[in-house]
């Protein structure tokens, strides 16, 4: 038996008990003997005092009213209905956010269609629209490679231009060393190459006297020292950048 059915059963028992009891006669009245025969037996067996019978009668009435009032508000089905109504907008919002994030386009439902539907926008939908607009602006700042099959994305247009030269084969940075015909697509590549002609090794190990043309070669070498720390290379770079 469920809790609600049990409450109905107890309330019914209380009402039946109330109906089987009779009111206590006032002082000086002569009630009918037949009508008071059953209550007198109950009073004799259970209480033995008419005052106790009246208290028991009032208690039963109070319990019955309380059970009937509680039975009007059953908290069994209400949470399920509310949870369904609250979860469905979140599911719709999540589907729209996935489309906006992956494709970078706005959701299929336009603001005009939402207004025509007659439903007022909830605070969650307004908050999500603000997050989606920020994500859209962030995606517009990205620079995607237009070459078919590449799909790489860069945060700066200069990085995209340098990368696109890999597909086109363009090398606008030639080496100016005599009799050197090499060309490069990036200026930093030309700088590193030019040091091979000059013999310049400006990256010195902070723990020994070795020098290197490239910073990555220096880092790889310095990690072999047991007392090495990355901050040592940063300090050496600042010293080279400062004027003598």
Curated annotation (Swiss-Prot):
Assigned GO CC terms: nucleus
Biased composition (Basic residues): 134-143
Keywords for the protein's UniProt record, in alphabetical order: Biological rhythms, DNA-binding, Metal-binding, Nucleus, Phosphoprotein, Repeat, Transcription, Transcription regulation, Zinc, Zinc-finger
Modified residue annotations for Phosphoserine: 122
Region of interest: Disordered: 24-51, 79-143
CDD domains named in the record: KLF9_N
Oligomeric form and interacting partners: Interacts with ZZEF1.
PANTHER family: KRUEPPEL-LIKE FACTOR 9 (PTHR23235:SF132), KRUEPPEL-LIKE TRANSCRIPTION FACTOR (PTHR23235)
Name of the protein in its database record: Krueppel-like factor 9
């Amino acid at each position: 038996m469920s809790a609600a059915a049990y409450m109905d059963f107890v309330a019914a028992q209380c009402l039946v008990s109330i109906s089987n009891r009779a009111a206590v006669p006032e002082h000086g009245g002569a009630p009918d003997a037949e009508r008071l025969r059953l209550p007198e037996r109950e009073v004799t067996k259970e209480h033995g005092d008419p005052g106790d019978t009246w208290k028991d009668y009032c208690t039963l009435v109070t319990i019955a009213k309380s059970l009937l009032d509680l039975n009007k508000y059953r908290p069994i089905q209400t949470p399920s209905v509310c949870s369904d109504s609250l979860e469905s907008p979140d599911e719709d919002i999540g589907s729209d956010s996935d489309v906006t994030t992956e494709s970078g386009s706005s959701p299929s439902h336009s603001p005009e269609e939402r207004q025509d539907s007659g439903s007022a926008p909830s605070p969650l939908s307004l908050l999500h629209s603000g997050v989606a607009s920020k994500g859209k602006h962030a995606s517009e700042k990205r620079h995607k490679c237009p070459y078919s099959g590449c799909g790489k994305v860069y945060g700066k247009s200069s990085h995209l231009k340098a990368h696109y030269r890999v597909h086109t084969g363009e090398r606008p940075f030639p080496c100016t060393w005599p009799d050197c015909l090499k060309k490069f697509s990036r200026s930093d590549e030309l700088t590193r190459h030019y040091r091979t002609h000059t013999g310049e090794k400006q990256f010195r190990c902070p723990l020994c006297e070795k020098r290197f043309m490239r910073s990555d070669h220096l880092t790889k070498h310095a990690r072999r020292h047991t007392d090495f720390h990355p901050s040592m290379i940063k300090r050496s770079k600042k010293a080279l950048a400062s004027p003598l």
